[in-house]
Regions:
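Extended ligand-binding regions for polar small-molecule ligands
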Residues: 27-43, 87-96, 155, 162-168, ...
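Bilobed "Venus flytrap"/periplasmic-binding protein-like clamshell domains
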Residues: 67-69, 79-95, 127-128, 145-204, ...
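Extracytoplasmic small-molecule ligand-binding "clamshell" domains
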Residues: 27-126
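Acidic, polar ligand-binding/catalytic clefts
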Residues: 87, 100-163
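Ligand-binding clefts/hinges and TM-proximal coupling segments of bilobed small-molecule sensing domains
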Residues: 31-50, 176-199, 235, 239, ...
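Short helix-initiation/N-cap motifs at beta->coil->alpha
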Residues: 85, 102-113, 156-157, 195-210, ...
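A ligand-binding cleft/hinge motif common to bilobed small-molecule-binding domains
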Residues: 110-113, 126-135, 182-184, 211-245
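Periplasmic-binding protein-like
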Residues: 143-151, 228-269, 286-298
């Protein structure tokens, strides 16, 4: 799956359109049980509301750096509603803690700065990398596998990362792919006497998709579940190979916000114990096998 993520800005919908969107509590978009209201009534969650009184009734600001289909994206039925794995989990986390949440959008490459500076309280699931851990902490509960997006028919015959030599990869600025995966593969290519991997740096995933569609890029690497969903929604594209990554994915929270980190960790433990996260992973396309025991990093 991909987490550095990671962020698919739906074509034609800008981040500013939904800036400041109010809490997703207003309309749950998944049928999975236990639902948000169920967690609000659980004894374990009532205990957490007592343990973290400063969060009860608080509006938690969720920063978004674009949209990633399957993780967080405007609903096709009602674009004013953000749906996906992250909103489904945020609904349950905030309900368990007696809090509320709202969304604000911006550029992906400044998302962590927004969280560490306090402009946002928490972000969507992202790759947990050593570089990011220098700036931010995480509450992580998933393992990562990248998928790929190609033009229909795979005209460049790209079947694995080894086929990226001499090709152009679209990558979002600040993403794991841009900072690590592509540079490392390019180094392997040149060491083998092959052409380097070119990188087309863009500001969000929507631009990456458009780059593949227009031919400016040969491939886009993103979370595996998102890659499948993107290709399914756009008949000019197809999903390709996958890459296992030695990375977990988690919610970024400021290092100095120990209360929120501890509260989210505790709430996620309740959610995992209920079986809801595995069900949500299957429902939104990431696959329940990606779940790992929730941990705090950083």
């Amino acid at each position: 799956m991909k987490f550095a993520r990671i962020a698919l800005l739906i074509s034609g919908i800008t981040g500013t359109l939904l800036a400041g969107l109010t809490s997703a509590h207003a309309a749950s978009t998944d049928p999975i049980t236990p639902g948000a209201s169920d967690f609000a009534a659980m004894a374990q969650c009532k205990a957490l509301q007592t343990k973290y009184p400063s969060l009860k009734g608080k509006d938690l600001v969720v920063g978004l750096g674009g949209y990633t289909k399957g993780f967080e994206a405007p609903s096709e039925k009602d674009p004013s509603i953000i749906e996906g794995l992250d909103p489904s989990l945020f609904e349950r986390i905030s309900s368990c803690l007696g809090a509320k949440h709202s969304y604000q959008t911006g550029s992906f490459n400044v998302l962590l700065t927004s969280i560490s500076s306090g402009r946002a309280d928490i972000g969507p699931m992202l790759y947990v990398t050593d570089e990011r851990l220098k700036q931010i902490a995480f509450v992580a509960s998933m393992q990562v596998q990248d998928g790929s997006i190609l033009a229909k028919g795979n005209p460049k015959k790209i079947s694995s990362v080894d086929d990226l030599c001499g090709k152009t990869v679209a990558a979002a600025a600040g993403s794991y792919e841009a900072n690590k995966l592509v540079p490392e593969q390019s180094a392997r290519c040149t060491a083998a006497g092959k052409p380097e991997v070119s990188m087309l740096m863009v500001q969000n995933t929507d631009n990456s998709i458009q780059a593949v569609k227009s031919g400016r890029a040969d491939i886009y690497l993103t979370e595996a579940g998102s890659a499948i969903a993107i290709a399914k929604a756009d008949k000019t594209l197809q999903s390709g190979f996958t890459v296992d990554l030695p990375i977990m994915v988690g919610f970024p929270i400021a290092k100095d916000n120990a209360t929120l980190r501890s509260a989210v960790l505790d709430a996620m433990k309740v959610i995992q114990e209920s079986g809801a996260q595995k069900k949500l992973l299957d429902y939104w396309g990431q696959g329940s096998a990606a779940e790992r025991p929730v941990v705090e990093r950083g």
